[in-house]
Amino acid sequence: MRAGRRRNLLLRLLIGLLAALCVGALLSQQLTWRLDTWIYDTLLSHFEQPADDRIVIVAVDERSLSELGRWPWSRGVHAELVERLQRAGARGVALNVMFAEPARDDPAGDALLARALAESGNTVLPVMAEPVEPGGMLIEVMPMPPLIEAAAGLGHVDAAIDRDGIARHAYLRAGLGSAHWPSLAVALLDTHAGTDADRALPGLRDPRRRQAAPYQWVRDHHIMIPFAPHGAFAQVSYLDVLDGTVDDALLRDRWVLVGATAAGIDQGLLTPLTGGGPRLSATEYHANVLNALANGQAIIPFPGPRQWLLAIALALLPLALYSERSPWRRPWIVFAVVAAGTLLCCALMLRYGRYWFQPTPTLAVLAAGYVAWTLSRLRQSQRQAHSDALTRLANRRMFDLTLARELKAAQRSGRPLSLLLIDVDHFKHYNDRYGHQAGDDVLRRTANVIGVHARRPRDLAARYGGDELTAILPETSAAAANALAEAIIRDVRALRIPHLGSEIAPWITLTIGVATYDPKRESGAVDLLQRADAALYRGKHEGRDRSQRAAGAAIA
């Protein structure tokens, strides 16, 4: 029993180790990324994120373009907008328009914009990275120096796009060589809070950020965005703000993001909530980042070590719960409960903990484990249908099927086929003296010896009935079969199993009848069995503890 428990424990440890390695491989290689993102998108679509009414978008829309002319507009127009927002009492302004070079034909507009930025004191401008040439080295594109000096801050506008083209993430700091620029949303928050740029930010840190090359775009403070429904943020037209149509109360003490929404300027972004609807403008993307940060709702990818530990722990849970003696006797219930628990854990962590835990590696290992368990049970059932429960040798049905098959093979090939019938000497006396449990142990130990010798792929050791065992030996001559029988007798005798009631020896002995198929004598299995049985009883009659060839068996 103890050995059985040790084997069971060792098997569980090996299965647990394999499951942990599989989870680790799936996580490290991101092999379940598509399923994980599908689950994330589905959950996110069911958790409505309210839009903060302190956030207002001033849209460069089609109507503004129609009235104010072709894009880009004079910087004097933008200066007028900044002044208008300052007079309305905006909390902070993000002017998401790039002014990288002086306007060749409008230097006055540049000066007006610089003055308006300086006077407002709460307007931030964008920074972006773009290649010098297609596929070339990246450079940071920043506003021209007078505007940098006048602006309250700069923020990068890098929108993180996944491999499927969907924007789910944001990085709160980024830059070339090091993550030195805050995101546009962080820069906008800092204009009102007056906090240091190095303040604690949420998000997953990048451990590789310190080893980046000088011209590598580095991202840090990784978050996932809980998007509000499309159109949830208050939005007014650039033109309406400029001509005073918009009431100051709508802008007072608000974070204002100014940017393009017109399709000709902004191509838009796909998000988990897009579906078949319109794309999200870049400005609305940054509004969602601001919304998450302002309300402490940013979603953090579950940190790597904790993701691994929780995923592996959940994958190993069926091993801890399942036992044939426990209430969890049905494995499909165990696997179903753990799988449902994994999804529930994922959903609750996302909804209330604001952490994203990837569930699919655990679910994949659970599914694979259940399939493997089912296949193992099927194989075990097949073995039980063809094996003897006590000796673990083949049962009588399997013996009959195998003997018939091997006889046909011997008839076709002309190769010899030998059969051993094995009897434990004075087994009834042994049972009477030592009890049936001891008798069962004798049969098991004898069966083990037979299995050691009849070990070729086509050999079959079986329990013929009662205390009689047998072995089918394809392509084995009478002499070879007799030698094998003698070896079995010798090895069982060497076990020194006490048998004080035996008239032959003080330990267990065997008598074996050996018959080799002769196509001239036998017409089938019955004849071969009768010859082996006759040899067995002749061996008993001659004193037992021996092997006896059937009459007429060929020696070679």
Regions found by a protein language model. Name each.
Residues 391, 420-423, 466, 532:
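Conserved metal-coordinating catalytic motifs of nucleotidyl cyclase and c-di-GMP turnover enzymes
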Residues 382-383, 396-416, 447-455, 474:
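Short regulatory alpha-helical coupling segments
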Residues 447-451, 480-500, 531-533:
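Alpha-helical scaffold within the catalytic cores of cyclic-nucleotide enzymes
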Residues 382-401, 422-436, 444:
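Conserved nucleotide-binding and Mg2+-coordinating catalytic segments in signaling enzymes
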Residues 105, 109, 442, 471-491:
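Short helix/loop segment flanking the catalytic signature motif in cyclic-nucleotide metabolism enzymes
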